[in-house]
Design a protein with these regions (language model features):
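Surface-exposed, charged secondary-structure patches
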Residues: 81-125, 223-230, 235-242, 249-257
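Short beta-strand edge/turn micro-motifs at domain boundaries
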Residues: 114-157, 161-164, 168, 285-289
Length: 321
C-alpha cells in the first residue's frame, strides 16, 4: 500500500476506527517522517496544479483509494517515491483514513494555506495546499516541515510518558527483594543480566513474576548507538546534585541503589526526532530543557540528577496530579 503512506504520516485522525489502528499508524508515520527529513529540497519535483484546493484534495484521496501510483505521481510530483515509503503500509491504515474522510471532510483555511481536514476531531493532512498564479498545488517542502514538527511533538510527549513509566517501574521493582539479601533497592540498569532479575526487565517464564518494564522499551533503551525508543535515548542516573530536592547525595550505598533513582532522556537526532531533553527522579516530576545540538554529549556525560533553574518543571506531569 505505497499510496497510503501519504495518509499516515501524521497523528491519529481521532475517529473510533482510526484509534483502533493508532499504534500501527504511528510506526508508519515515524518511518515516513524520518525518510522525508533526509530528503534534499532540490529533489522535490513540481506536482500537478489544480483549479481549486478541493480539486487537489479530491485527486489525492482518489489516488489513495485506488492505490494508483501513477495518479499519486501526478498529484504530488514524479519524485513522490523518494519521500513516501513504498513498503510496509497496511491496508487497514488506508481504510481508516478513508473512513474518516467519508464521515466528514472539508478544506480548512488558515495561515495563508489550505489543508484537507478529515473526521470530526480536526485532524489535517500535514501536506498543505497552496495557491499560486496558476492554481493550487501540494507544498511538499512545507509538508516536510510539518511532518517533522508533528513527529517531534509526538516523540516528546511519548518520552515524558515513558519516564513516568520508568518511575512506576522503579517503585514496583523496589517493592520486592530480588536477590534474597533482605534489602529493598532500585534497579541500576534497564535490562537484567540473563538468568537474573537485577534490571527493570527480564524474560519471565510461565509462573514467574512479570518484570516491571516492557521488553520493547527496555531493549531499545539499552542500544546506545541505535535508533533509541520513540526517537530518544535513556540513561539511569545514580546520584543527584545540589539543585535537586534534598541536596546532593549518592543513590547507591554499598553497591545497592537504595536512596533514590533518576533518569534522563535525550533525542537520538536533535531537531529530527526531538528537541527537548527530559529528566525524572524518585519525586516523580518531569523536567525539560533544550540542551542544543550537543545535547547527546551533554546528556551522556551527566552523572547526577541536578535540575537547576534552566530546567523547566512540568507540573501537569507530576505523579499523583
Amino acid at each position: 500500500m505505497a499510496v497510503g503512506a501519504v495518509v499516515v504520516v501524521a497523528d491519529g485522525v481521532g475517529e473510533e476506527q482510526i484509534m483502533k489502528t493508532k499504534i500501527a499508524m504511528f510506526s508508519v508515520s515515524l518511518a515516513a517522517g524520518i525518510a522525508l527529513a533526509l530528503l534534499p529540497a532540490t529533489l522535490l519535483a513540481a506536482p500537478t496544479v489544480y483549479p481549486t484546493a478541493d480539486a487537489a484534495a479530491t485527486a489525492l484521496v482518489d489516488a489513495v483509494q485506488k492505490d494508483d501510483k501513477a495518479a499519486l505521481a501526478k498529484v504530488l510530483g514524479p519524485d513522490w517515491k523518494t519521500f513516501v515509503p513504498a513498503e510496509g503500509i497496511d491496508r487497514e491504515d488506508v481504510d481508516a483514513f478513508l473512513a474518516a474522510y467519508k464521515t466528514n471532510h472539508k478544506i480548512a483555511e488558515g495561515g495563508g494555506v489550505s489543508r484537507l481536514e478529515v473526521g470530526n476531531a480536526g485532524w489535517t493532512l500535514p501536506i498543505p495546499i497552496v495557491k499560486s498564479g496558476t492554481g493550487y498545488t501540494f507544498d511538499l517542502k512545507a509538508g516536510h516541515d510539518e511532518i517533522i514538527a508533528r513527529q517531534i511533538g509526538r516523540n516528546e510527549l511519548d518520552t515524558q510518558q515513558a519516564l513516568l513509566a520508568y518511575y512506576d517501574a522503579q517503585r514496583d521493582y523496589a517493592a520486592t527483594d530480588h536477590n534474597g539479601d533482605k534489602v529493598l533497592e532500585y534497579a541500576q540498569k534497564f535490562l537484567s543480566t540473563p538468568g537474573k532479575t537485577d534490571g527493570l526487565y527480564w524474560d519471565s517464564k510461565e509462573g514467574e513474576p512479570e518484570s516491571p518494564l516492557g521488553p520493547l522499551f527496555a531493549a531499545h533503551t539499552q542500544k546506545a548507538g541505535a535508533e533509541g525508543y520513540q526517537g530518544y535515548h535513556y540513561r539511569i542516573l545514580t546520584a543527584q546534585g545540589t539543585s535537586a530536592p534534598g541536596g546532593a547525595y549518592d543513590y547507591v550505598v554499598g553497591g545497592r541503589m537504595r536512596n533514590g533513582f533518576a533518569a534522563i532522556a535525550y533525542p537520538v537526532h536533535y531537531g529530527e526526532t526531538g528537541v527537548m531533553s527530559f529528566m525524572i527522579s524518585h519525586d516523580g516530576i518531569v523536567f525539560e530543557k533544550d540542551l542544543g545540538k550537543n545535547g547527546a554529549a551533554i546528556a551522556q556525560a551527566m552523572k547526577t540528577f541536578d535540575p537547576d533553574d534552566s530546567w523547566k518543571e512540568d507540573d501537569e506531569l507530576a505523579k499523583g496530579e
